[in-house]
Amino acid sequence: MADNPKRILIVEDNEIDVRLLKDILEMRGYDTLQTGDGLEAINLAFANVPDLILMDIQLPEMSGLEVTRRLRGDERSRRIPIVAVTAFAMGWHEREALDSGCDAYVSKPISMLGFLRTVESFLPRFSN
């Protein structure tokens, strides 16, 4: 495994989904941070500069789309890949997420293999 594991920020307000994503990612050797609050997600991204952000679209207070737009608007976070992970499954939801600055879109319930393929397309698990 890599000496310096990649860090993934999970922005999700559903505790069951957080636990599932965290377990899958940590089982694959990634470090995780998590929050269910949009403003805290922005602050964590600025303070920790994760290698990838998994963004729920439907958050309390501030939507994941707004969080994504704010992260894209700041030099400290604009290059961090962001993957929308959401129960919204209509085609226009995906377009809206991508237009807001997300790099990819994964629908819930997730397929573990498809989810990991998406994550690993942005973050190789092992360093060469």
PLM regions and their residue ranges:
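C-terminal output helix
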Residues: 16, 110-120
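Charged docking surfaces used in two-component/phosphorelay signaling
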Residues: 19-27
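Short hydrophobic/Thr-rich beta-strand motif most characteristic of the beta2 strand and flanking loop
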Residues: 29-36, 44
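Active-site beta3 strand of CheY-like receiver
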Residues: 48-54, 59
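The feature encodes the CheY-like receiver
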Residues: 60, 78, 90
